[in-house]
Amino acid sequence: MNLDIQVNEEIDLLRETVRQFAEKNIAPIADDIDRDNEFPQHLWTELGKLGLLGITVPEKYGGSGMSYLANLIAMEEISRASASVGLSYGAHSNLCVNQLMLNGNDQQRELSLIHI
């Protein structure tokens, strides 16, 4: 099996952007998140502003239209700052958004994806 993964400038920029965001906004509160067992809602808003919550969703449905590699890179950098936030992000992007994209019809996608 050949895993020839092509990393381009877009992926490099994404990695650096998410890493900086995570270091500044997630890492300083990671212990609090784990101790309190509570996810800070403001992080969802910020992740959305970065275009990460619908990273693999086509732009016509309100997403960023990026690859699964981009999703993986974002999750990796978020998880570097907080495994808890990384797991929440992964669940959102793979169990929720991805399933709507893959298994929903156009009407469901148009109604739902832009809001999550």
Region locations from a protein language model:
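Glycine-rich flavin
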Residues: 13, 20, 25-113
